[in-house]
């Protein structure tokens, strides 16, 4: 069996969030339909710390992207969704329910959801996130 990538394991974890209406999360792809979700890796220096024994503390940063309906009233709902998602991630850390990445330390949101782009009827919101894990030498 082929081992899953770390970003795929992150996607699997996010798909367990009860706030997602259709439950399906893509990687580096978001549909133009509302209630579409994607995990989009962002380029960062992966090594946070190198240890004397050769082990390392590493990070993956990514955006959780949400395609949502866009209007004055919908924007209030979308803002609440982003806040609720942030709280869900926080609660998962508290109970140690994390992505199934070996050596994982945490997953967290680095900010609230903000609008990346809009059309007349939809908006893409992004929530910047980080996973930190340790790798032995």
Task: Locate predicted features.
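Extended compositionally biased segments used for macromolecular assembly or nucleic-acid engagement
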Residues: 34-38
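Charged, amphipathic alpha-helical segments and their flanking helix caps
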Residues: 1-25, 29-31, 43-137
């Amino acid at each position: 069996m082929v081992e899953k990538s770390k970003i795929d394991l992150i996607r699997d974890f996010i798909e367990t969030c009860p706030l997602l209406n259709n439950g399906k999360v893509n990687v580096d792809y978001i549909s133009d339909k509302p209630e579409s979700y994607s995990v989009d890796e962002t380029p960062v220096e992966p090594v946070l710390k190198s240890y004397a024994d050769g082990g390392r503390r590493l990070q993956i940063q990514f955006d959780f992207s949400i395609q949502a309906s866009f209007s004055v009233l919908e924007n209030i709902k979308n803002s609440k969704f982003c806040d609720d998602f942030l709280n869900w991630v926080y609660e998962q850390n508290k109970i140690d329910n994390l992505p199934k990445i070996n050596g994982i330390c945490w997953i967290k949101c680095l900010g609230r959801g903000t609008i990346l782009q809009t059309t007349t009827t939809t908006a893409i919101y992004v929530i910047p996130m980080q996973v930190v894990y340790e790798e032995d030498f």
